[in-house]
């Protein structure tokens, strides 16, 4: 039987109400506390959302009613792990709408 030394744990769910969207980038909650192995963005609003890792450049487009999972540690073993750095702040922009936009993050 395999030996498992690590557990995956969630950070606090981050969200922003799409009614507050202005068309400019806004911080999506707080920066990551831990280096993330996987992140899921869920657009539960009725508006398309653009995601940025720096608040300036467009990095991902997440249509209304959809989600996007970024599993940077998938199929990685040993010391060659890839993570999203602790302290990373994500930003979103879109037109004001109804519903919320969420981010779930997971660390080991």
What are these regions (language model features)?
Residues 39-45, 92-94:
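Asparagine-centered strand-capping/turn motif at beta-strand->loop junctions
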């Amino acid at each position: 039987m395999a030996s498992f030394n690590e557990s995956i744990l969630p950070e606090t769910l981050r969200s922003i109400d799409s009614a507050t969207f202005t068309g400019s980038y806004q911080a999506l909650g707080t920066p990551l506390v831990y280096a993330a192995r996987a992140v899921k963005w869920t657009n539960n609003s009725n508006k398309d959302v653009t995601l940025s890792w720096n608040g300036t450049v467009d990095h991902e487009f997440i249509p209304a009613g959809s989600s996007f999972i970024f599993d940077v540690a998938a199929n990685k073993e040993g010391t060659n792990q890839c993570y999203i750095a602790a302290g990373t702040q994500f930003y979103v922009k879109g037109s004001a709408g109804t519903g919320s936009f969420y981010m779930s993050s997971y660390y080991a």
